[in-house]
UniProtKB/Swiss-Prot annotation:
InterPro entries: Ribosomal_bL34, Ribosomal_bL34_CS. It comes from Yersinia pestis. This is Large ribosomal subunit protein bL34. NCBIfam families: rpmH_bact. Belongs to the bacterial ribosomal protein bL34 family. Transmembrane segments: none annotated.
Amino acid sequence: MKRTFQPSVLKRNRSHGFRARMATKNGRQVLARRRAKSRSRLTVSK
């Protein structure tokens, strides 16, 4: 049986990357929450 997780950096960044987060109001809220928590990584990209 094929595993469900087939990693792809491009798909990962397009859905969860910094520019994807910045593109929507809710995405910017996600970044704001992560900044407030002082997360070392805001998004999977970078």
